[in-house]
């Protein structure tokens, strides 16, 4: 039972981090609208999104799990 729970936790954490990474990439390319569209598709909550000219920083939550990701592009 413990291994099963640990596996579930790892999978949930990975999902949240992958979602944050994907949303950060979408945001740096397509802005707020793209980030929100992916948020809805992935069924996560963006708790913070900071966009600059060349960078997106996103904080995502799913249940008790949170993740942060930064994406940038050379410009």
Identify the residue ranges that each predicted region occupies.
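Short amphipathic secondary-structure patches
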Residues: 22-75
């Amino acid at each position: 039972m413990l291994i099963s729970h640990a596996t579930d936790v790892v999978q949930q954490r990975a999902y949240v981090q992958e979602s944050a990474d994907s949303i950060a990439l979408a945001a740096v390319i397509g802005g707020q609208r793209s980030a929100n569209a992916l948020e809805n598709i992935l069924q996560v909550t963006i708790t913070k999104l900071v966009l600059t000219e060349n960078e997106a920083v996103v904080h995502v939550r799913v249940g008790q799990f949170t993740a942060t990701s930064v994406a940038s592009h050379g410009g």
